[in-house]
UniProtKB/Swiss-Prot annotation:
The keyword Cytoplasm does not apply. Changing residue 13 to A: Complete loss of CTL recognition. One of its GO terms (biological process) is cellular response to tumor necrosis factor. This is Minor histocompatibility protein HB-1. It comes from the Eukaryota.
Length: 41
């Protein structure tokens, strides 16, 4: 019973890392897409 909170914290931490990584990837794709658009213009 005492081990549950630790597992929950671990999951929340990994989820936070996953979210931040996803945001970084989205930003990278967006920047690359916008730069290619400006390059075409």
């Amino acid at each position: 019973m005492e081990e549950q909170p630790e597992c929950r914290e671990e999951k929340r931490g990994s989820l936070h890392v996953w979210k931040s990584e996803l945001v970084e990837v989205e930003d990278d794709v967006y920047l690359r897409h916008s730069s290619s658009l400006t390059y075409r213009l």
